C-alpha cells in the first residue's frame, strides 16, 4: 500500500503548490482524499502499485479539463456539463460501490469497527467546539486504544522504526487501464472542491471564485494531485474540516495554512509517526470507511434534494435509474 509518510509529504507539498497557483490568497489545506482509498486498493490488486499511481496522475486530468472549461466559459459550464440529475446519482453510486471495501476491512474485527464507527458518529452529533470538527480522528483514536488494551496490537514496527526516515517514494508506470479506472472517481472530489471554495467564501467574506478565480483553485488542486501520483502519494482534496476550524476560530489567514503544510512535510520524515499510522488495525479503518462512504452516498442524495429534482418525471427517473445501474 501507500506509505503514510509519503501521504503527509504530498499533502504538505500539494498545499504549497495550491497556494502558489492561487497567489497565496485562498486559505485551503489539501489532504489525502478518503474517496480514493477503496479504488486505490482495488486498482492495486488489478494493476499493481506503479500502474495505480499512473491512474492517480490521470485524476489530475479531470481538474485540468474543468479548470480550462471554467476559464473559457465561466462557472456555469459546470452546471451545464454536470446537471444535478446526473451528478447526484453518480455520487450515490461512488459511495455505495466503495462501501464493500469498508465492509471487508471491518469484518476482520467487528467490535473494533463498530466501536470506531459509533465514536465518530457520537462525536459528530454531540460534541462541541473543535472536537466536533474531528470525528474521524476521534473514532480512529478510540478504536486504536481499544485494540491496544483488549487485543494483540502489534507495536513492534513502532518500536523498531527510526526516529528520522525519508518517505518511501514510488514512481508510476503509465498505462491507460488504471487511468480510465480512476478518472470517474475524481468527479465527486471535483464537485466537493467547488463546494468547499464557496464555503470558504462565506467564512472569509471574500469571493475566491472571482479572485484568484475558480479555474486557479481547480488547477492548483490538479497539480497537487499530479505531484502526489508522481511520487507515490494518494490524490489530495480540499479539507472541509479545516474550513470548519476557520469558521470556529476566525483564523482565516492563508499564511497559517502554509505553516500547517510545512509542519506536515516535517512530520513526514519522522519514522515513528509513519510506523504508528501503519499499525492502525484494518478493522478500525473499515468502520470509519463505512461512515465516510455512506456520507458520500448521502451527499449525492442531498444533491438531488437541494436542487429539487422531480423524480415523478419520467425523464429524470430514467436518467437516475440508468446512472445507478449501467
Locations of regions flagged by a protein language model:
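N-terminal signal-anchor module of multipass membrane proteins
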Residues: 1-27, 35-46
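Generic transmembrane alpha-helix signature in multi-pass membrane proteins
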Residues: 1, 37-46, 100-105, 198-200, ...
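Membrane-embedded helical hairpins/re-entrant loop segments and their flanking transmembrane helices
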Residues: 1-19, 184-254
Amino acid at each position: 500500500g501507500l506509505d503514510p509518510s509519503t501521504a503527509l509529504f504530498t499533502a504538505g507539498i500539494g498545499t504549497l503548490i495550491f497556494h502558489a497557483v492561487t497567489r497565496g490568497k485562498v486559505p485551503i489545506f489539501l489532504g489525502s482524499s478518503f474517496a480514493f482509498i477503496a479504488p486505490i486498493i482495488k486498482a492495486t490488486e488489478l494493476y499493481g502499485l506503479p500502474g495505480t499511481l499512473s491512474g492517480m496522475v490521470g485524476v489530475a486530468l479531470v481538474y485540468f479539463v474543468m479548470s480550462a472549461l471554467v476559464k473559457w466559459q465561466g462557472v456555469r459550464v459546470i452546471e451545464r456539463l454536470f446537471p444535478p440529475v446526473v451528478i447526484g446519482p453518480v455520487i450515490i453510486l461512488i459511495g455505495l460501490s466503495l462501501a464493500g471495501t469498508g465492509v471487508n476491512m471491518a469484518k476482520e474485527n467487528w467490535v473494533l469497527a463498530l466501536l470506531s464507527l459509533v465514536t465518530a458518529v457520537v462525536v459528530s452529533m454531540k460534541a462541541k467546539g473543535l472536537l466536533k470538527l474531528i470525528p474521524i480522528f476521534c473514532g480512529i483514536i478510540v478504536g486504536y486504544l481499544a485494540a491496544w488494551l483488549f487485543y494483540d496490537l502489534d507495536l513492534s514496527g513502532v518500536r523498531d522504526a527510526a526516529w528520522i526516515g525519508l518517505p518511501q517514494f514510488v514512481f508510476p508506470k503509465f498505462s491507460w487501464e488504471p487511468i480510465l479506472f480512476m478518472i470517474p472517481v475524481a468527479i465527486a472530489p471535483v464537485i466537493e472542491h467547488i463546494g468547499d471554495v464557496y464555503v470558504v467564501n462565506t467564512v472569509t467574506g471574500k469571493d475566491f471564485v472571482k479572485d484568484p478565480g475558480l479555474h486557479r483553485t481547480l488547477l492548483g488542486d490538479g497539480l497537487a494531485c499530479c505531484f502526489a501520483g508522481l511520487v507515490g502519494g494518494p490524490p489530495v482534496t480540499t479539507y472541509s474540516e479545516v474550513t470548519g476550524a476557520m469558521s470556529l476560530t476566525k483564523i482565516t489567514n492563508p499564511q497559517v495554512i502554509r505553516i500547517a503544510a510545512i509542519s506536515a512535510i516535517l512530520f513526514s520524515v519522522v519514522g515513528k509517526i509513519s510506523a504508528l499510522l501503519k499499525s492502525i488495525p484494518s478493522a478500525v479503518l473499515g468502520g470509519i470507511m463505512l461512515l465516510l462512504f455512506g456520507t458520500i452516498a448521502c451527499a449525492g442524495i442531498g444533491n438531488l434534494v437541494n436542487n429539487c429534482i422531480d423524480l415523478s418525471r419520467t425523464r429524470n427517473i430514467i436518467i437516475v435509474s440508468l446512472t445507478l445501474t449501467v
